[in-house]
A protein has these predicted regions:
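ABC transporter nucleotide-binding domains
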Residues: 1-242, 325-327
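Short catalytic/signature loops enriched in Gly
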Residues: 5-7, 26, 234-327
């Protein structure tokens, strides 16, 4: 049996809460998350807008300090002092969803990619490093792009420049927040193929944050489904997406164009993160509970009153659902 590699980056019971206004309770944006990403692995973090996935990504990047729990990178707890954080951010790079907003319209492609090198005091051949990063990102020959400005590039080329700006520092892990959301469908596949190639060639790890389970299917090794600040289902992507166990995962999958049957329409909106309901945090919108299936399984009361707990974030398929556990 092949031993499981230790996580390169892991969240350990991470909480991120924001103070409420005018004495209101704190908003629990991330409410106890365990998540691990190994070397050479792509993990998709999936959920609706407002579920806490971007806040979790910011905590993993060191952009916001957890209010509970912690982040471990390469076996060492993440420190939030200036020097330690600067060294960490060289090894873990962010790729944003909107390349137009990420790139200064006045800067050339060369300057945009070289910016990270200058911030981190790179002492080698800057031009060679920029050329190598652009080439790895699929902009060849790289010298053709040095003096271009963002408005002279297509959307896909701009996203490749953003990726090159991350690659130039030779990171070990990318955090990509909706990396293809702003791109035309014809270009999305090219960027996803690029991320897969970088994983294979460089053993580069990635956390891909997305609302799109279809994207997760195409790129990820593992998937973590997030709802109201918690991971509610996680595991190898093929197992989770072909045989989803949590009602929320099932609902997200049901609206994909290729999904069989009728889409599951969830009623209402996710609860306010400052007023997380007792029991399963999904129970107020759960079609299994509303349809009587949880009652027939003898778990309806548990759904309403008992927290399913925090998933451990390991390689196995895990689900935070009383009904799924009873089946």
């Amino acid at each position: 049996m092949t031993p499981v590699k230790p996580a390169l980056l892991s969240a350990n019971r991470v909480h991120v809460a924001f103070p409420g206004l005018h004495g209101a309770p704190d908003a629990r944006a991330v409410d106890g998350v365990d998540l691990g990403i190994r070397r050479g692995e792509i993990v998709a973090l999936v959920g609706e807008s407002g579920c806490g996935k971007t806040t979790l990504a910011r905590a993993l990047l060191g952009l916001v300090a957890p209010t509970g729990g912690g982040v471990v990178f390469d076996g060492r707890p993440l420190e939030y002092s200036g020097r330690s954080l600067k060294a960490y951010r060289k090894r873990v790079q962010l790729v944003l969803q909107d390349p137009s907003g990420s790139l200064n319209p006045r800067h050339t492609v060369y300057d945009a990619v070289a910016e990270g090198l200058r911030i981190h005091g790179h002492r080698g051949d800057e031009q060679a490093a920029v050329a190598e990063a652009l080439s790895r990102a699929g902009l060849r020959p790289p010298e053709r792009f040095f003096l271009r400005h963002p408005h002279e590039l297509s959307g896909g080329q701009r996203q490749r420049v953003v990726i090159a700006g991350a690659l130039v520092l030779e990171p070990e892990l990318l955090v990509a927040d909706e990396p293809v959301a702003s791109l035309d469908a014809s270009v999305r596949g090219e960027i996803l193929a690029l991320l897969l190639r970088l994983r294979d060639e460089l053993a580069l790890s990635a956390l891909v944050v997305t609302h799109d389970l279809g994207l997760a299917w195409n790129i990820a090794d593992r998937v973590a489904v997030m709802y109201l600040g918690r991971i509610v289902e996680t595991g190898p992507v093929e197992q989770v997406l072909t045989a989803p166990r949590h009602p929320y995962t099932r609902a997200l999958l049901s609206v994909l164009p290729e999904a069989p049957g009728d889409p599951v329409v969830l009623t209402g909106e996710p609860p306010d993160p400052s007023r997380v309901p007792p029991g399963c945090r999904f129970h107020a919108r759960c079609p299994i509970l509303a349809g009587g299936e949880a009652e027939r399984a003898g778990v309806a009361e548990a759904c309403r009153t008992r927290d399913p707990g925090i998933l451990t974030g390991d390689d196995t398929v895990q689900v935070a659902c009383h009904w799924a556990a009873a089946r």
